[in-house]
Regions:
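Short, acidic/polar
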Residues: 26-39, 85-100, 145-148
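Acidic (Asp/Glu)-rich catalytic clusters
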Residues: 6-7, 41, 63-71, 94-103, ...
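N-terminal binding-site loop/beta-alpha segment at the start of enzyme catalytic domains
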Residues: 1-73, 265, 275-276
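Short, well-ordered coil/turn segments that N-cap beta-strands
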Residues: 11-15, 43-46, 70-73, 102-106, ...
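Active-site mouth loops of central-metabolism enzymes
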Residues: 18-30, 77-87, 111
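Beta/alpha (TIM)-barrel catalytic core signal, keyed to glycine-rich beta->alpha loops juxtaposed to Asp/Glu
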Residues: 3, 113-276
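Active-site groove signature of glycoside hydrolases
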Residues: 97-116
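A short, structured active-site edge motif that brings together acidic residues
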Residues: 71-84, 107-111, 141, 164-165
Length: 276
């Protein structure tokens, strides 16, 4: 499994598992748990969730899925911005830990920026780190100017920025990804196949056919081409998660990258960070 190195020096799988909208339907619960467990077995040991997902339902499902496997999983969750204050963040974290059936998070993120000052959130995160509730912390959906402000406000401990990034959302390549590279901060790409919407593209399909792969696998391989980017697709079935895993083994050629650049051109000017 390809890995990404965090600022701490710790390595994590370049291909993880997302959980948005998991745990919300009883008829899919067994399948979703089986998918997460299958992903762990094949090396996709980074699992990303959030208190927002199903109002905690995804965290509860993840807690069940990783029972007995906690030490082998890199567990990520995210806090609502309204819970990112000095007083609220500890309570939010402890509620997430209870749902996840664990005593610590490997990485805890601010889900998006709200009204709480970044300096206060950074301080609250460092307190959770000191108390052992979390091992590392980061942010999500923050653009380069936000990251500048975060670092200036005492947020040097930020380990990652989780962002919307895929073939049709290449805006981060203009400013944000270079900023993260300069500061040796990793990125996590959520919705790396745009919820399946980009998979009918003819160019993507042609490359997939030549490689005896699926368009989704090619799209994931494209995201993982960068050394500091972790892709976190969601898969609700064992079959789907095993299909995603094969993306790690795909080697795209220079010609493939050129074809994808022509079909999915990067923006020529900077644009605000998009989010879902």
């Amino acid at each position: 499994m390809k890995t990404v190195t965090l600022p701490s020096g710790q390595t994590v799988p370049a291909l993880g598992q997302g959980t948005w909208k998991m745990g919300e339907r009883r008829d899919r619960r067994a399948s979703e748990i089986a998918a997460l467990r299958a992903g762990i077995e094949v090396g996709m040991k980074l699992i990303d969730t959030a208190e927002m997902y199903g109002d905690g339902a995804a965290e509860t499902l993840v807690g069940e899925a990783i029972a007995g496997e906690r030490d082998g999983v890199f567990l990520v969750s995210k806090a609502y911005p309204q819970n990112a204050s000095r007083d609220q963040l500890r309570r939010a974290c402890e509620a997430s830990l209870k749902r996840l059936r664990t005593d610590r998070l490997d990485l805890y993120l601010l889900h998006w920026r709200g009204s709480v000052p970044l300096a206060e959130t950074a301080e609250a995160m460092e307190r959770l780190k000191a108390s052992g509730h979390i091992r590392q912390w980061g942010v999500s959906n923050l653009d380069a100017d936000d990251m500048d402000e975060l670092i200036a406000a005492g947020g040097e401990g930020c380990a990652t920025d989780q962002i919307l990034y895929n073939l049709v959302r290449r805006g981060p390549e203009r400013t944000l990804l270079p900023w993260l590279e300069r500061h040796q901060i990793s990125a996590m790409a959520y919705s790396p196949v745009e919820q399946g919407k980009l998979l009918r593209n003819p160019a993507l399909g042609a490359i997939a056919a030549r490689l005896e792969a699926t368009p989704a696998q090619v799209a994931l391989a494209w995201v993982m081409r960068r050394d500091r980017v972790v892709a976190i697709p969601k898969a609700g079935t064992v079959e789907h998660v095993l299909e995603n895993r094969k993306a790690v083994d795909i080697a795209l050629s220079v010609a493939d990258f050129a074809t994808l650049d022509a079909s999915f051109p990067a923006p020529r000017t900077a644009r605000p960070l998009e989010m879902l």
